[in-house]
Amino acid sequence: MLKDNPLIFLTVTFLTAWSASYNAMSQTERTQPQLSAIIDSLEEQDQKWRHLWTLVHNHQSTGSLTEGEILLNLRQTDSLNFFTLKKIIGEIGYPAIAEVGSTSSKNFWLLVQHQDRHPEFQGRVLKLMKVAVDAGQAYAEDYAYLLDRVLINTGQLQVYGTQMVLDSTKTSFKPKPVSDMVNLNARRKYVGLPSIEIYIQEMNERYHEFLTSDK
């Protein structure tokens, strides 16, 4: 199953890596610690099953859990999280850094990134997140990832080149179709992302097992 769905694995592992770096950050002071705890608990379950999915791909032990059981739990977790995320958005809008802290704010973004089965919801969150970014209450680089995700999921050109795919030779990753490729690096720099060349290099190093030269 995993060999037939390499892009699913790439999405899982790439976002897992982002989550790990985010959780290393110190949580800023927050006015809604209970909401922060809820978001973090959702993220914990999210990452639990994505970590196990990564172990399966790397042919490492997952105890008594089978690949099918892990994938089922991963999908069920995403489905259950959707209802909680939707409730949070409906009640307070996008969780601001001042409300839930920097880590929980990023965790919320990460959870929304995983809601590809609900592109309309992702689009709704995107609009609210833009307001938060403009107010300094969410991170521009996170917004860039979600914007690209929404655009690609709705058949449009991405803006920041964050969504990747293997090239035709399967020797390197490349960004999925981007609008105004000439000014891509300027846009990436503006929101705090590295150049597309560095990003491609990082992807190739991180997911080298998917490249033809490593098989």
Task: Go through each PLM region and give its residues.
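An amphipathic alpha-helical core segment
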Residues: 129-194, 210
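Generic detector of ordered secondary-structure context
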Residues: 5, 77, 121, 179-180
